[in-house]
Each structure stands twice: as structure tokens, then as C-alpha cells.
A protein has these predicted regions:
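Bacterial Sec-dependent N-terminal signal peptides
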Residues: 1-27
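A solvent-exposed, acidic/Ser-Thr-rich amphipathic alpha-helical stretch
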Residues: 26-32, 46-98, 107, 119-122
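A short, structured loop/turn motif at beta-sheet edges
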Residues: 95-102, 118, 131-137
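A short hydrophobic beta-strand element
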Residues: 100-112, 125
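Sequence/structural signature of outer-membrane beta-barrel proteins
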Residues: 111-115, 148-150
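Short beta-strand edge/turn micro-motifs at domain boundaries
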Residues: 124-151
């Protein structure tokens, strides 16, 4: 009988510990959904989604070209075909929340095409996106991307 209670206690402790470890901020799923929507919209060149739903009018960007820019500059790049990719993969490694701010970090692999720098090559980069929850919606207020490898 003592063995039964010992096993029951261990089993309950493992269940509780697993539940605590697997507990996730409910906002994380929404940020992951929006990150994927942003990635897909860039890949498709869907300016309506990017301009109206994802990118804040106040967004600033530290670009892979090592230039600090604004949302207007990013919009101009999109319109001119300078954000034109054959493929765009994003691997989120960490999402952290601080009140109404979400910080997303990870890696991206893109394959630029057309007249872009590195067209036809595989470009690996590190990224950080900063999201702000305001007026009942999330938008990107800052982005940083750094090229780490071109093949």
C-alpha cells in the first residue's frame, strides 16, 4: 500500500510540474499567428495586410543593409520590388512579454529574387520584431534584421 501512495504522489507531482512547464501565455499564440501572417504577406507582396494590419505607422527598422529606416521606407521597398522573395522561412526562438509589448527573436532564411542584392542566393539572418498592443490590436513598432550568411 505504501508503494501505491508513493507512486500516486510521484505521478501527481509529475502531472502538476508538466502543467506548469507547459503553461503558455495566451498572447503567444496570437503573436505567432501574426508573425506568420506578416511573413506570408511579405512573401506575397500583400501591402494591404502589411500597411493596414501589421506594420505600425510609427515602425522603425534596422535593415539587413545596416540602415535605420521608417515604415515609409519599408513600404517604398515593398512597392518597388525590393522585398521580393522566392521563399521566406522564419524560426521563432523566443517570445517575451512586458505589459503590452511583445519581443520576438529568432532566425530567418530568405531567397531574394529580381533586382535585389543577393538575388538567387540563400540568405540567413537573425531578427527581432517588437510588437505593441494598442487599441485592441497588435502591430510591429520596431524590427531589426542582420544578415549572418549568404550562400
Amino acid at each position: 500500500m505504501k508503494q501505491f501512495y508513493t507512486l500516486l504522489t510521484i505521478s501527481l507531482c509529475l502531472t502538476i510540474t508538466t502543467s506548469i512547464v507547459l503553461a503558455q501565455d495566451p498572447r503567444e499564440a496570437e503573436i505567432k499567428r501574426l508573425e506568420n501572417l506578416e511573413r506570408e504577406s511579405v512573401l506575397k507582396g500583400d501591402s494591404a495586410v502589411l500597411f493596414d494590419k501589421i506594420w505600425s505607422p510609427d515602425m522603425v527598422v534596422n535593415t539587413p543593409a545596416n540602415v535605420v529606416g521608417t515604415v515609409e521606407g519599408t513600404k517604398a521597398h515593398l512597392r518597388s520590388g525590393n522585398l521580393n522573395y522566392i521563399s521566406f522561412e522564419r524560426n521563432i526562438e523566443k517570445i517575451t512579454f512586458n505589459d503590452n509589448v511583445a519581443i520576438v527573436m529568432g532566425g530567418e532564411i530568405i531567397k531574394p529574387q529580381g533586382h535585389q542584392v543577393n538575388a538567387g542566393k540563400t540568405v540567413s539572418r537573425r531578427f527581432t520584431n517588437v510588437w505593441l498592443y494598442k487599441n485592441n490590436s497588435w502591430s510591429i513598432i520596431a524590427r531589426q534584421a542582420t544578415i549572418i550568411k549568404v550562400e
